[in-house]
Amino acid sequence: MPKFMLLQNYTPIEGVEPISSWAPEDINAHVAFQLALNNELVASGEFVDGQGLAGPELAKFVTFDGVGAPVVTDGPFPEAKELLAGYRIVDVESEARAVEIAAKTSAAPGPGGAPIRQPIEVRQVMGAPTPEL
């Protein structure tokens, strides 16, 4: 079965305040939704991994030319249009099933329980290169 990564980005969503400004009960409902979805995917045998990530203010970009010391730049990165907020990896029968899970993820509750319509990027996991390459 193919694996897909469902990527959630810190992308402004029209009409939805950033989660840092949500009421505690709205944050709790959002997290509970994500955990329930993970549990549903575990029960169906489709869940591989999923994690929420620390905010962009804690991120670091690292570049290295192979000589000397790497260059480390601390976040946040206002010039970046999208920064990864979290992901799920699912092992599903088809891309259509991955899209179905992404749609459910997109409808996670936000302030007042309204679906936030967060864009979810769906990408097939291709696996590691084989020695024949």
PLM regions with names:
Residues 1-133:
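Conserved, structured core segments of small domains
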